[in-house]
Amino acid sequence: MPDPSTYRPATGTIPVDPGVYKFRDPHGRVIYVGKAKSLRSRLNSYFADVSTLHPRTRQMVTTAGSVEWTVVSTEVEALQLEYNWIKEFDPRFNVRYRDDKTYPVLAVTLNEEYPRLFVYRGPRRKGVRYFGPYSHAWAIRETLDLLLRVFPARTCSAGVFKRHNQIGRPCLLGYIDKCSAPCVGRVSAAEHRKIVEDFCDFLSGRTDRLVRQLEARMQEASEELDFETAARLRDDVGALRRALEKQAVVLGDGTDADVAAFATDELEAAVQVFHVRGGRVRGQRGWVVEKAGDVIDWASVDSEAGSDLPLLVEQFLTQFYGEQAALSGATDQEAGTSGVPREVLVPVLPPDAEQVQEWLSGLRGSAVRLRVPQRGDKKALAETVQRNATEALQQHKLRRAGDFTSRSAALQGIQEALDLDSAPLRIECVDISHVQGTDVVASLVVFEDGLPRKSDYRHYAIKEAAGDGRSDDVASIAEVTRRRFLRHNRDVGVLRAEAAGADADQVSGGDGGDLAPEAAIDPQTGRPRRFAYPPNLFVVDGGAPQVAAASAVLDELGITDVAVIGLAKRLEEVWVPGEEDPVILPRTSESLYLLQRVRDEAHRFAITFHRSKRSRRMTASALDSVRGLGETRRKALVTHFGSVARLKQASVEEITAVPGIGTATAKAVLTALGAEEPSADVVGVGDDEPDRNGPGTAERNGADIPREPVEQHGPAAQSASQRTGVE
C-alpha cells in the first residue's frame, strides 16, 4: 500500500489557480478525478494526517501512487474538464451515474433515410432520439400503438423494410393504415420524415398545435361533406387526447423542467429524476450509486442532516447532463431541442451553483435556471420525486438484505475480519436513547442468519446509570450488558438443572457454556427458548469506551464465548476490545452493510421506546396509578368535574354519579389524589418486554409489567422472573 508522503508534491509546486487533478495508482491507472477553485488548498488537504481523513478518502490516497493536475482559467472550464476526464478514464473512486440500460425507452432513428420507431434497451447512440425511460415496456407499446394511427411511421427493422421493398407489398401495418408504407413508395422520404417529426413534437410536449391542426382539417372535411375523412380525423383527435390522458398535467403548460431528488445513507445515494415537458411528466429515471470519496470536513458535517447533499447534486448535474448533451449531438440541435431543459429543480443548490448554471446554459445553447422549489405545484412535484427516491433506496436495501447469498457472504466476511471461530449466526446489538439524561432507555435487537428476529427484541429502562437528569452512556451499556447476561446465566443454570433432573432451586448461575439440544427446547411449545443460547457476536453502538465496558462485564460474569465489538457512527469503524486501532471494513462490503442494519435497527427500536416513555411521562397524572381506571373512564371523570383539582374536592357519592364509576373505584381515586403523585417510573415500562407484534408494540404492552430487580440472583431472581411473566 503506497504511503501518500512518497508522492506528495514538493512544497510550493502546486499552483493556487483553479484546475482539475487526477490521482493514479502505481500501475498508472486513473482512480480519482476532482476539481478545485484552488489546487494547492485542495491537494494539501489530501496529504494531511491520514488518520483524520474520511475512510473512503483514506482508501483512495493510500491506493494512489501519483497525482497530476491541469490549470484552467475559469471554474466553468474546470467543470467541463472534470466531466471529460471522468468520462474518459472512468475512475473507480468517482460516482458514476451510468444510464440504467434496464429501463425501456422509445427510440427514433433520425439518422436514417426513413426513420424508425421502436422500443429499445441498451446504451445510447448518436443520431437516435430517445423518449423515456418508462417503467414498463408495455406502457410504451400501448402508447405507440395508439399514436401510430395518427403518425403512421415505420416501425419495422432494416431487414423487414428491405424485403417488402423487394416484393413490392407492405406489411400488415401498411394495410391497416398504421404505417405509411415508405417501403413501397406510398410516401416520399421527405413526407415520411415530416410524419416522424410531428410524432417527436407530440412526445416533446408540443401537443396543442397538432391537435388544433387536426381539428381544423376535420372541420374543413365536414364542410366539404367528406364525412369519411372527417370521421377518421375525429378518431385521430380522440387517440391523441387518450394518449395525453395517460400523462397527467403536473405543471403549467409549456413548462420544461427536470425535477431531481436524493435519498442518502452513510454509503449510498438514490437519485430520482422526473422529466417534465410541456407541463406533463414524460419520463422517469433512477439510480442507486455509491457515494464519492471527496475530501469533506466531516467534523463539521451532520451526516443525518445530509450535509454532503450539495456535493452529490453537483456531481449528478455535471455527469448526467454532460452525458445527455453528448448523446443529443446534432440530431437534437436540428430538432431545436437539447438534452438539457430550461429549468432544473433540485433539493439544494450545489456549492458552485453559478458556475454549474453557466455550464448547463452552454450545453443547452440558451439560459438554464437552477432552482430549489419553495411553494406551489413545483414544490409538490419535488416532494413526490423525493418520496420516489426514498422508496427506491428502501427497496434497494430490502433486495440486498433479502438475498441469501449476500447474507451468507456478510456473515463470512464478519468472521474473517474479526477472526472469529465461526460465522456469527446470532448477533445482538444494544443502543441507548435519551434526551439530556431524561427517560434513558436501551434496546436490544437480535439478528439470526442475517435477518431480524423481532420476537427476541427487548427494551430496558436504565436504572442505575441514569436519573436526576444525568446519563452515562458507557455505564448504561454496562448495565444493559450485565442484565442481559445475568438472565442468560440464570436460564442456563435452570435448564441444566431441568436436563439433569435436579431441583432448580439448588442450581446457581452457569458459565454461559453450550446446552444439550433437548434442554434448549421449551417442552410446552416445542420451540427453542428465546435466550437459551448466547449471541455469537454482541454489538454495542459506540466506540472504544463502550466496547471496553461491555467486555469488562462479560469478563466479570465469566462469559468467554461471546465476541464484543462496537460500531462507531459517521466513520463506521469497528472497535474490538484491547485493540488501539479499529477494524476498517470496505465501504461496499456486505459485512459492513449487515452491521449497519443491526445498529440502525437497534437505534430505531430504542428511540421508539424512548418517545413512548417520554410521551407517557409528559401526559401522566395521579389518576394513571388507579387500578381498573382506564383511559375512557379517566376522561369521563375529568370531563364531568372539569379538572383534577375539582375531582379531588368531590365526595364518593359525587364521583359514583359518573357513569361506570363504582364505590371502590371512587375511593381509590380519592386515595390516589390525596397521596403524593407517582413519578413516571411507577407506571412506566416493564423490563425485558418482548416485541411480539413488530415495531412499536412492546412499548404499549410493557406498561403494567413490574420491573425485575437487577441485583437478585439464584432462586430469588428466578422467582422474580416468573412473576414478571417474561420468558
From Swiss-Prot:
Region (Disordered): 503-527, 679-727
Chief localization: cytoplasm
Source taxon at top rank: Bacteria
GIY-YIG domain sequence ranges: 16-95
GO MF annotations, alphabetized: DNA binding; excinuclease ABC activity
Polar residues bias: start-end ranges: 718-727
GO terms, biological process: nucleotide-excision repair; SOS response
Compartment(s): Cytoplasm
UVR domain mapped to chain residues: 208-243
Pfam family, one: HHH_5
UniProt GO cellular component terms: cytoplasm; excinuclease repair complex
Keywords (A to Z) from UniProt: Cytoplasm, DNA damage, DNA excision, DNA repair, Excision nuclease, SOS response
Biased composition (Basic and acidic residues): 701-711
Family according to the record: Belongs to the UvrC family.
Main function: The UvrABC repair system catalyzes the recognition and processing of DNA lesions. UvrC both incises the 5' and 3' sides of the lesion. The N-terminal half is responsible for the 3' incision and the C-terminal half is responsible for the 5' incision.
Subunit structure: Interacts with UvrB in an incision complex.
HAMAP family noted in UniProt: UvrC (MF_00203)
Name by which UniProt lists this protein: UvrABC system protein C
Organism of provenance: Rhodococcus jostii (strain RHA1)
